[in-house]
């Protein structure tokens, strides 16, 4: 999965994060982070490296969902590349009931308008097709259609992208009241 995201310059993995839980007990409040600097998700020893982080005081602990962190590339209206940490996030769950994966986006470059509601067609055109292509390739790889996540204040998944916002006088909603920073 990460190879597809890398191919589209959406996620260059540099770390993995996960929590530990124990069946019948729940979350243990123990969080791990493993740097991939100098390593790779393709490393055959990686699963053992993750398991070796099991807390000593909890030999029955199991890993929860694994968050793949890193930077991705987005393009501005003039075509200039920008690297952005956590442009997209990939969460994979090794659950024995059935593995799952979730791809999340947290940037306005995927939508037709920025967070202030200003249309940005050149930015959308430079970025949204890459996300769409990656999602379609992930569906092919996994052999299962993606299920859209819950709608948020910032948008709603539609097909292999984001639903177009409602516009008034050609402007989308101003969402900056909820933007941190």
Language-model-detected regions and their locations in the chain:
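Structured alpha/beta or helical-core interaction and ligand-binding surfaces enriched in interleaved
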Residues: 1-118, 124, 128, 149-152
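Acidic, proline/glycine-rich low-complexity IDRs
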Residues: 96-181
């Amino acid at each position: 999965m990460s190879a597809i995201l890398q191919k589209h310059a959406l996620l260059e993995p540099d770390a993995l994060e996960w929590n530990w839980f124990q069946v019948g007990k729940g979350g243990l409040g123990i969080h791990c982070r493993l740097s991939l600097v100098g390593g790779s998700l393709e490393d055959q020893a990686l699963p053992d490296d993750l398991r070796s982080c099991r807390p000593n005081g909890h030999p029955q602990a199991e890993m929860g969902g694994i968050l793949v962190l890193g930077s991705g590339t987005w393009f501005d209206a003039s075509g200039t590349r920008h690297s952005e940490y956590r442009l997209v996030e990939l969460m994979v769950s090794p659950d024995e009931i059935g593995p799952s994966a979730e791809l999340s986006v947290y940037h306005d470059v995927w939508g037709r308008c920025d967070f202030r509601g200003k249309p940005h067609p050149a930015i959308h055109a430079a970025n949204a097709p890459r996300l769409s292509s990656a999602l379609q390739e992930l569906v092919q790889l996994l052999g299962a259609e993606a299920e859209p996540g819950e709608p948020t204040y910032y948008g709603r998944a539609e097909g292999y992208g984001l639903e177009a916002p409602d516009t008034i006088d050609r402007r989308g909603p101003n969402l900056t009241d909820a933007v941190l920073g």
